[in-house]
Amino acid sequence: MHRPLLPCYLVLLTSLVSAGEAIVIRASMAVTPIIESAKPLIVSKYPDASFKITPCGTKASIEAVAGGTAQLGATARKLKDDEKAAAPDLILTEIAKDGVALVVNSANPVTNLSTKQVVDILTGAVTNWKELGGPNGTIAPVGRTESNAVVEFLNGVIGVEHQVAGEGKDQGMLYKAKGAVAFGSLKVPVTGKNLDALAMVIKDPNGFTFLPLSVAREAKAKGSTFSILNFNGVEATDANVLSKNYLLSRSLYLLTKGEPQGVIKDLVTAILSPEGQKVVAERGCIPLR
């Protein structure tokens, strides 16, 4: 069962109105800013409500709601068949549209990458920007840790598989095109935080990374300088994300076990309201209406 959503983190909401019950919300990095900004929309009804936000991945969010340790979650994808089978009473509510941005340093003249070119960068088949119409410089990709929803999403769109290599600070990702026998020799360094990946690219003229479009837009609005590339010749505009002409487009969802009730229901309703959808836009996502 689906309805409209936004980005993901851990939100602990304590409402004295509900007899002190602690309401735990697990949400992604993309959705957390929306939840924070939507709080004033329900404060008059729940003046004693307080929020504590901690980050989590989509998988962790789903597991928390399914397992009863969180009353509200947020995901950047639909539920998988095994997740539905394990918890058939989970309900997704779509609240926003978002995308995945392909990002390079502002000094890089490259403006577009095709599906094959992104695959070639991640697998190490192409290692120099001059092979892609850019300057003579070794491409320095920055990947994301496995728990980040953008990894699975991007893999599915461009048709690659990954394998974790190394541990701790030495951890990275090996990539291969689906159907290929062997993984590429390039170990793509990874980070768990979107803004860390972005910071690396901002500092490195040869950098390349991918992250939620909403995060990239917010960073630009705050003054960060970098370039968001077109993908297969299509710009990541609101219209192109909504129409899915920009292939790296996705929906954001809130997740509950059964129909939302009480404070959670009002929070979901507030985010879906015209005022809430304005908040969605202010936080870099694309409103549903």
What is each model feature region?
Residues 19-98, 103-289:
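Exported/periplasmic ABC-transporter solute-binding proteins
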Residues 3-4, 29:
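Hydrophobic alpha-helical transmembrane segments of integral membrane proteins
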Residues 4-15:
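Bacterial N-terminal signal peptides
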